[in-house]
Amino acid sequence: VSVDCSDYPMPACTMEYRPVCGSDNKTYGNKCNFCNAVVESNGTLTLSHFGKC
C-alpha cells in the first residue's frame, strides 16, 4: 500500500475527510495531511492502510 506524495508539501490542505492510517498509528484526515506529515518526518512515516487506524 502506498500513496504518491510527490506533489507535497502543500501550504494548506482541504477539509475533505478521506482518512488514512500512518505507520505511527495516527489517523490523518486526508492524503494531503498525511503527505505533509511524511515530508516533515523526512520520509520515516509510511502509509499503513487507507481508512481510520
Curated annotation (Swiss-Prot):
Glycans are attached at residue 42. Residues 3-53 form the Kazal-like domain. Keywords: Disulfide bond, Glycoprotein, Protease inhibitor, Repeat, Secreted, Serine protease inhibitor. Gene3D superfamilies: 3.30.60.30. Its main location: secreted. Disulfide bonds join 5-35, 13-32, 21-53. Transmembrane segments: none annotated. The keyword Repeat applies. It is found in: Secreted. SMART domains: KAZAL. One of its GO terms (molecular function) is serine-type endopeptidase inhibitor activity. PROSITE patterns: KAZAL_1 (PS00282), KAZAL_2 (PS51465). The record marks 15-16 as: Reactive bond 3. It comes from the Eukaryota. GO terms for cellular component: extracellular region. Avian ovomucoid consists of three homologous, tandem Kazal family inhibitory domains. This is Ovomucoid. The lineage of its organism: Eukaryota, Metazoa, Chordata, Craniata, Vertebrata.
